[in-house]
């Protein structure tokens, strides 16, 4: 059985982690499936938003224990290859040209926090707990660190990477790791509301804006960075979509890309 299910509703694709019996912990097979799913969906013109969801009581518990047991006997070269696959999954999710929403219905541990951090928007139920537990096992949250630190900030990361404390959904909201905390009954409606906003924005502007965010965030404001921002807006203004958006605004009509 596949470790994922992929469903579609209009222009929204939902990728659901489907290993509830192990709290959606990932192994090498699941890592490959997630990587392939986001790579393929990101290339589809009929998909404008991707929701990452999970079955069962937990969103993702990080690495599967059986997979970790097998890693105990790996050589350094094998560990490099294995960690490289995990890093590729995280980067594929982070760089997916389509906007992504993490629908967090339960606890998120270790590598699972990387999945959340690599998504553009994160919505969690108020009962969800979070934990970067790697140091308790003598390990490091290495491959997920670029994404988690960007999401929660370096100061919060110092605390939660080093102490491996469990923190609540409200704390995740306070430090900026998630954007919304809702009750279980409100989760789907909030995700649908955000997805609706994303699919009705300019379908070419959204991935361009996502790339802009990744290029600009955390960078020094240099002449080169300013030139990049000038070039990006100039390119968009003369594009077919940019012209349509501006004309629709000036003429007080809806743009032709809207989905009802």
Predicted regions and their residues:
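C-terminal long alpha-helix characteristic of the crotonase
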Residues: 20, 123-128, 178-227, 240, ...
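Acidic, divalent-metal-coordinating active-site segment for phosphoryl/phosphodiester hydrolysis
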Residues: 165-171
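Glycine- (often His-adjacent) and acidic-residue-rich active-site loop
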Residues: 54-92, 108, 220-221
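Glycine-rich beta-to-alpha active-site loop
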Residues: 90-137, 166
């Amino acid at each position: 059985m596949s470790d994922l299910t992929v469903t579609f509703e209009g222009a929204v694709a939902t990728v659901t982690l489907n290993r509830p019996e192990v709290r959606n912990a990932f192994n090498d097979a699941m890592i490959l499936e997630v990587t392939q799913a986001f790579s393929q969906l990101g290339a589809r013109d009929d998909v404008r938003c991707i929701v990452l969801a999970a079955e069962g009581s937990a969103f993702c518990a990080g690495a599967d224990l059986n997979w970790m047991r097998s890693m105990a006997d790996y050589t350094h070269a094998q560990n490099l290859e294995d960690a490289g696959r995990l890093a590729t999954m995280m980067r594929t999710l982070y760089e997916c040209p389509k906007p992504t929403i993490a629908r967090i219905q339960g606890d998120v541990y270790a590598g699972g926090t990387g999945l959340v951090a690599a998504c553009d928007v994160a919505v969690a139920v108020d009962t969800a707990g979070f934990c970067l537990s790697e140091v308790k096992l003598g390990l490091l949250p290495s491959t997920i660190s670029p994404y988690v630190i960007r999401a929660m900030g370096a100061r919060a990361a110092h605390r939660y990477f080093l102490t491996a404390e469990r923190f609540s959904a409200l704390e995740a909201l306070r430090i900026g790791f998630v954007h919304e905390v809702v009750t279980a009954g409100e989760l789907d409606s909030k995700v649908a509301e955000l997805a609706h906003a994303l699919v009705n924005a300019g379908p070419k502007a959204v991935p361009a804006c996502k790339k802009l965010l990744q290029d600009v965030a955390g960078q020094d404001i240099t002449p080169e960075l300013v030139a990049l921002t000038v070039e990006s807006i100039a390119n968009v203004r003369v594009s077919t979509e940019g012209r349509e958006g501006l004309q629709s605004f000036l003429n007080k009509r809806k743009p032709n890309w809207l989905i009802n």
